[in-house]
Amino acid sequence: MFIYVDESGSFVPATRSDSWCVVAGYVVPEVVRKHVERSLSLLKRRVGCAYQNELKLRHLSESQLGRFLGELGDLESTLFISAIDLGHQDPQVVFAHQRKQVDSIRANRPNMLYEEGRASIDDLSGRLERLSPQLYTQMVAQVDLLDQVFRMATLYYAQRLPATLGSFKWRMDEKNSARPLFEQTLTHMAPALIQAKSLREPGISVEGFDHSHFDKCFRM
């Protein structure tokens, strides 16, 4: 499967409610990827947008958007969203949450037998500590999204297109590559946070669903 991830919003603290910021992941089985790309190409052509340019919502009429969503709805693709209203978040609580994560990483330093391990702890905790509050908030939302995809997409496609679970190919928003601290911190933090959550809240496996492709590629 291909998972296209993008965000909307600045993730900065807000003084009023309805200040939503969103990270979304659109999951496309490889067998229908060309159909999705064709629908997007036709939509851009209809509104006069060059294929290499990003299409914004303001470029579309309601009918054009409805038609495009209808085309996507006919495919076995799925959409996952992690959203947060910054108008209801206390900046001090966000800071405390970030501080707690940093401290929890550093707590493992004495357990490292070798200098390489201690250096890795120092590097990761330092990266996390240097994230701005808005990038930390975005990272938390993005990790939540990735966890959703792993938990729910596996259940969905194990019933419909089991072979889709043999590969997860992520396509992140290119803006993240211009923010190396964010991208590198997310890359290092996401696997550990998702694993920790799976230990606290194990994912669901349903007897009779076909997980064979997933198990073959990812089970130890």
Model-inferred region functions:
Residues 1-78:
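An N-terminal structural lobe/cap that precedes and organizes the functional/catalytic core
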Residues 83-220:
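A two-mode feature
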